[in-house]
């Protein structure tokens, strides 16, 4: 859709990336690291200073201390961390439960390592359906993948959901991969429920995070993974021969930038304001917005406008009205046939959002 948006000169609310500048303090830190000669390979698991800063951040947020030497690895983005975690644990014939709609890297990665993706759907109103997941578990289930806040749904897992997941995995050897790259994009006073908060989950989980989502630097491809040392040892075996190490000057910059918690504590309010701005405008259109509790994605039902399939409707809206969005069916293995939903990214400048709303109200 980004390609079509470019061809049509449309406002691009399809792909999930910000269109505003990053904090100058952060870009200055990167420049300083380069000028100071930090331009060669970093240690394979990441700079000790950055791993230490991550450990301090995690402990401050969740009250649990990961060992920076054995339980934290810096990665080339969240997607690489997911790829590496799956590569570390999936063997031919293993089953991995994926909750649709799902980020599009999950299923192909499972298949690449010889596993079999087992798809279940979110329930009513894009909520986690614990019973559907429970029914999908078999003796061959190797892992369960969860995502909160959720892309593309914009919903979050709450304490009750996490406890249900812990209950269903207790007594099994199933590994949890918890994709939490939008951890700081949780709105309306809700608390991010991380797998880290639950000992029964934490002891079996790879927990994945992204600096790009938090600090508006998606092009840097910087993230990190947390896991118990036994799991992390397997993770690093793949990581070493996949990327070896992530970008060195950016690691130096992030290690320094994390020292001020305000640099991530202000993120929820920043994006909640953008969510609200877009949502207020969207409610004046013929689209029906779904609940957005986190992430920077807003779903909207267009059933009152058209009965076209979402892929065709999304293309037509881009070509005829100059606004690009993602059809949600592409995030499913087997999309619901009566679903008419588009995903919009509101990680944009206010002017961009206002112009987008004007176009959406014309549909």
Question: Predicted regions span which residues?
Answer:
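Active-site phosphate-binding strand-loop segment of PLP-dependent enzymes
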Residues: 124-190
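Active-site PLP attachment segment
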Residues: 198-234, 249
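A short helix->loop->beta-strand "cap" motif at the edges of active sites that frequently abuts
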Residues: 115, 171-174, 201-203
